[in-house]
Amino acid sequence: MDATQLALVYSELETPPARLQKTVPIDTTFPEEEANRLAMMESFNKHLFRPNTYLHKWWARRSGTTFRHILKQLVPDISKRDYYSAGGLEGVTILDPMIGGGTTLHEAIRLGANVIGYDIDPIPILQAKASLSSISVSEKEQVYRSFERELAKRIGKYFKTSCPTCDRSADLQYTLYGLRKRADSEEVLVVDSLVLREESDGTQRTLNEFYPSGQIHLIGKTWKIITKGEAREKGINGKNSEILSVPFTERYVPLVIAGYCPVHQNFFKSLDSQDVKLLLSAQRWAGRNIKFPPSSFEIPNGPKSDDLKNRNVHYFYELFFPRQLIYIAESQAILTTIPQKHALWMSLLLSTSLEFNAALCGYKGVDKRRPGAIRHVFSHHAYSFPYTALENNPLFPRHTSGTLGNLFENRIVAAGEWAKAPIERRYVNHRWIKTTIQNEIDLGQEASSLSAFSDQTRMFLVSQNDSKKMPLPTNSVDFVVTDPPYFNSVQYSDLSHFFRCWLRTFLPDQSNWQYVAQSSAVAESEENEAKFGFVLGQIWQECNRVLKRPHGRLIFTYHHWNPNAWAQLTLALKKARFLLTNAFVVHSENPISVHIMNLRSLKHDTILVLRPRGPQKKKHWQKPEPIEDFDSYSFCKACGNMMGWILEQDLSEQDMTKTWADFLKG
C-alpha cells in the first residue's frame, strides 16, 4: 500500500465524529470474561498479537486486547461497541501521559481516535513515531535491501568460514565461547553444557567431538573445558575465580563455529587457523578504526547497571566482540547516507538488533525443540552473564533468530502488513480463529499541534515531555488512558541505557538524550517511596486539568502486592481530586513467564476508572474486609474496592497508609 492508497483508506474511513454523552459505558460495564479469555491467550505471545507495537525492545508491556476492550467501552454508539466491530472513537481525543510501549496509542488510533502521547524517556517516543507513521512497506524494503547490501560489502568478510567436509567457503552463523575462570594457579574454561545439540532421535552433538582430551589449545595457550556444574563442585564459582583484570570480551575463548554450507548444510566445527586469523584481523581493525567517545557510553549507577560495574565493565561498548563493534560502526556510517525519512525506523531496528548481537548473549540451542539458538541479552529482565556466550552473525542469510534480516521481516515487514489489516483472535466452536478487522488500520498521520486534530481522525501528537507539566489547554482531552510505572520498576529505566547510548549515536538530534531519568514516577529505594506518589500526583493533577467535563475519565491498569505502592497511588489520586467510578479485573501475566515463575506474583491487572471530583456527595463504595489469603484475582478486585472507599473518605496521609497496611497485612 503506497502513500496514495493509504490516503484513499483514510478517506474511505471518514465517518461522522463520535458523539460523546455525559455517561460513559465503562462507568457501569466491562466484559471481564471475554477480556480475560483474550488477555490470557495474548500473554503467551504478545508480539504475535500486536506486531506493530514491537519494533524496539521495551519492558512491562500491557495487553493490547485489554486496552482495546477498555477503549471499546468508551464508544458511545452501541452498534460499534463490540470488540470485533471497526472504529467507534472517530475524532475523540485520547491522551497517554506515560506511553511506554505505546499500547494505548496504537489501540486508540485503530478505532479512529486522535492521540496524544508523552514520555520522559526518548525511546518510547521514537518507537511510537516510527510505528505509527505511514511509510509503505515496499519503500522500506527498498531502503533496507540497499542498506543490507552495502553492509555486507563492508563486514561480510569477517563472517566467513569453511565447510569441514568439503572446504568450501561457507557462511558463519554463530561462534560459541567459553568463559575463562581462575582455578588455583591456572585457568579453566567454563561452559553451560558440553552438549551442543540434541537431535530429535536423542543423539547428541557435544564439545567432546572437537576436544576429545577435554582441553583446547589456542594461540599458545591451553585450557581445560569444564561445565558450570563441575565448576560449582570444585568451588570455581566465587569472586576469587573471576578474571576481571582483562577486557570483558577477552574473558571468553572461542570454542566452536556453527555455519552453513550450500552442499552439506548445517555444521559445527572447531576453529581452524583461518578462522583464528579472521578473528585477529577483526580485532586489529576494530582497535585501529573504532573510537566511540567514552563519555557517551559510560555506564551509569543503577540497580542493574551496578552488576556490570561489579564485573569491571564501565562502558557499554565493552560488551561487544570486535566483529560486533565493526557491525555497529559500519551500520552507523551507512545510516548517514539513507534518506532522512527512513533514518528513524532503521536506527530503531539496528538498536534492537543489539540485544541479539552482544557478548552477553547466551546459547539455548541445546534443546531439541530449539526455539532459536540465541538467548538474548534481556531474556530475564536483567544483565545475565553466560558461561557459554554466543557471537551471532547479524547478516547470516538464512532464516534464524537474531539476524538483522529476520528482525526486519518480523518487526518491519510483518508488522507493517499487519498494521494495514489488523488481525484479532476469536474463540469459535472451542477453537481460536484469526479474523481481520475490516476498515481499521494501525497507522496515522503526525500532527504538529493540537489544532491539527480538528475534524480529523487518526492523527497523532507524540513528543518527549515530562507530564508533570503538559503543553495542553484546559478541557482539551476526552479520555486519559494509560499504564503508570510499577512503583519501584527502576530497573526498566536502568536497563534501557543499554540501548539509549547507541540510539543517541544513531539519532543525535532527534531527542533530548540528557534528560533526567530520576524525574520519572518511580521509587528508586524504600527510603524514597513517597516520590512515586508525589510525581504521579502531579501528573494526575495535569490529567484532571486537561480532561473535558462531564464525560472525561482517567483510566489505567495497575497491580502491586506492596501496600505502600497502593497507598502512594491512592494519595496521588486524592491530591489530584479524582474519585473511583468503577474497577474491573483482567488477566495480565503469563503464569509460565520466566520473569514471574515461582514468585508470589500477581497475574491480573486492576482496571481503574476514575472521574474528576465534582459536587456530588453520595458515597458509592463500601469498605472491604482485610485480605488474609493470597489469590491473584480476588486480591486485585479487593484492592480496587479499597481504593474506591479511601478516595471517598477524609483521611490523612498517615491514616491512608495505615489503612492500606492493615488491609494487605496477609
Describe each model-derived feature in a short phrase:
Residues 2-95, 105, 109-473, 491-525, ...:
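Nucleic-acid modification enzymes, centered on SAM-dependent nucleic-acid methyltransferases
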Residues 98:
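Conserved glycine-centered beta->alpha loop in an early N-terminal alpha/beta scaffold
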Residues 101-102:
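Conserved SAM/SAH-binding loop
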Residues 480-481:
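Hydrophobic beta-strand segment of the Class I
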Residues 508-510, 551-559:
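Conserved beta-strand signature within the Rossmann-like core of class I S-adenosyl-L-methionine
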Residues 533-551, 575:
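A short glycine-rich, Lys/Arg-flanked "PGG" loop and its adjoining helix->strand segment in the class I
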Residues 568-575:
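Conserved helicase motor "Helicase C" RecA-like lobe of SF1/SF2 P-loop NTPases
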